[in-house]
Amino acid sequence: MKPSEMRNLQATDFAKEIDARKKELMELRFQAAAGQLAQPHRVRQLRREVAQLNTVKAELARKGEQQ
């Protein structure tokens, strides 16, 4: 999901998206520990998406406070 798409999400959707990505990240970490990780690039991608979601969420919160 692109940051421009993230900015169109509702507040409740941010929590759902972050939780879904963290859950998938946890599953991939278990696979990596077991040596069965098929897509190692997905771990980095998920970490980046979680960070982007948190950043956009904070930006929107700051924008709401300023108005």
From Swiss-Prot:
Pfam short name (any one): Ribosomal_L29
One example of a Gene Ontology biological process annotation: translation
GO cellular component: cytosolic large ribosomal subunit
Presence of the UniProt keyword Cytoplasm in the record: no
Keywords of the record: Ribonucleoprotein, Ribosomal protein, RNA-binding, rRNA-binding
GO molecular function, one term: rRNA binding
Keyword field contains Disulfide bond: no
InterPro entries (alphabetical): Ribosomal_protein_uL29 (IPR050063), Ribosomal_uL29 (IPR001854), Ribosomal_uL29_CS (IPR018254), Ribosomal_uL29_sf (IPR036049)
Disulfide bond annotation, renumbered to this chain: none
Sequence similarity: Belongs to the universal ribosomal protein uL29 family.
Cited PANTHER family: 60S RIBOSOMAL PROTEIN L35/50S RIBOSOMAL PROTEIN L29, LARGE RIBOSOMAL SUBUNIT PROTEIN UL29C
NCBIfam families: L29 (TIGR00012)
Complex and partners: Part of the 50S ribosomal subunit. Contacts protein L23 and trigger factor when it is complexed with the ribosome.
HAMAP family: Ribosomal_uL29 (MF_00374)
Function: Binds the 23S rRNA. One of the proteins that surrounds the polypeptide exit tunnel on the outside of the subunit.
Protein name, per record: Large ribosomal subunit protein uL29
Species: Deinococcus radiodurans (strain ATCC 13939 / DSM 20539 / JCM 16871 / CCUG 27074 / LMG 4051 / NBRC 15346 / NCIMB 9279 / VKM B-1422 / R1)
